[in-house]
């Protein structure tokens, strides 16, 4: 029920939403039933956690995560596996692109600050 709540009931705390997001993705991988894939996913998640959290520093990305996770869950509940997989891929690609933009912006700010 975390992801399928009205907008007014969404948690604005990026750190908490980041933890829920991580659990959501781990649950999806675990549901596939491949223990080795789940183990590898957990290992990768541990390694990239600090970078992934950048995605939850902006309210727009928190809202988008709620919307995207809700759509993925609805597709799964309706047994539309291909649609769920497509939505999940799009969600991950969007998140990666946003984190990349945030990272580049932070690097730019650091360079500008260092040049002063």
Residue locations for each model-derived region?
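Conserved amphipathic alpha-helical segments that form helical-bundle/coiled-coil interaction surfaces
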Residues: 1-57, 65-78, 83-94
């Amino acid at each position: 029920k975390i992801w399928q709540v009205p907008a007014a009931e969404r948690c604005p705390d990026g750190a908490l939403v980041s933890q829920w997001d991580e659990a959501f993705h781990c649950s999806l991988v675990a549901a596939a039933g491949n223990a080795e894939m789940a183990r590898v996913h957990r290992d990768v998640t541990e390694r990239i956690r600090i970078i992934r959290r950048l995605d939850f520093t902006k309210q727009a990305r928190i809202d988008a995560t709620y919307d995207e996770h809700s759509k993925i869950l609805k597709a799964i509940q309706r047994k539309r596996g291909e649609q769920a997989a497509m939505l999940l891929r799009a969600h991950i690609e969007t998140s990666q692109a946003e984190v990349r933009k945030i990272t580049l912006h932070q690097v730019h700010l650091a360079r500008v600050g260092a040049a002063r």
